[in-house]
Regions:
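Serine-dependent protease modules
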Residues: 1-204
Length: 205
């Protein structure tokens, strides 16, 4: 844990230096080390590096010729060696995929597996030392808990954070086919097209 806290502190120090240089502020967003809840600003500083933007290229052939379009969504870094989690519907029709990390680095991504029933997909990029997100359990949430969604709404507003509360838990939602229901978290944090696949954080990160 000490090594992990040190590595996280070093990343936050680099981020703070960039903020100071660009905005001329000395305000600190140091993450609490005593296990207490973070403020929204502290949470953003601690977690935004683990969130990625995903762009897919979709090619269609018809009697009128070949057309190319794009799809966009969000995701989060699962492991330091480049595994990324997103929603299946973000990537399933794409011919090629690009993952963009918070520092602007672009990686070609491969689809490693998908579960269309539960709308989950796993991608892989060739990288090491990536800042992985910390996974939690939805069973630990309570209605009224503050949460934050970080993602790429509308495919253009990368690294956007919105704040809200857990409005409901264990909401049964039917899939588009109607054959399966998925237990969902209900929140009033603003979520738009392009947020799909992105993480929902509690105030402990």
């Amino acid at each position: 844990w000490e090594a992990r806290d040190l590595a996280l502190s070093e990343k936050l120090n680099v981020l703070q230096k960039q903020i100071d240089e660009s905005a001329g502020t000395s305000k600190s967003y140091t993450v609490p080390t005593d296990g207490s809840a973070m403020t929204p600003a502290q949470l953003y500083a601690a977690c935004v590096d683990s969130v990625v933007a995903i762009t897919g290229t979709v090619t269609s052939n018809s009697v009128y010729g070949t057309t190319t379009g794009t799809s966009s969504g969000s995701g989060f870094i699962l492991t330091e060696d480049g595994y990324i989690v997103t929603n299946c519907h973000v990537v399933e029709d794409a011919d090629s995929l690009t993952v963009t990390t918070h520092d602007g680095t672009e990686y070609e991504a491969k689809l490693m597996g998908k579960d269309s029933t539960n709308d989950v997909a796993v991608l892989k990029v060739e990288a090491t030392g990536l800042p992985a997100a910390t996974l939690g359990s939805s069973h630990d949430l309570s209605i009224g808990d503050m949460v934050a969604a970080i993602g790429n709404p509308l495919g253009k507003l990368s690294a956007t954070q919105t704040i809200g509360y857990v409005s409901g838990i264990n909401r049964e939602v039917s899939t588009s086919s109607g054959a399966t229901t998925i237990s969902m978290i209900q929140t009033d944090a603003a979520i738009n097209p392009g947020n799909s696949g992105g993480p929902l954080f509690n105030m402990y990160g």
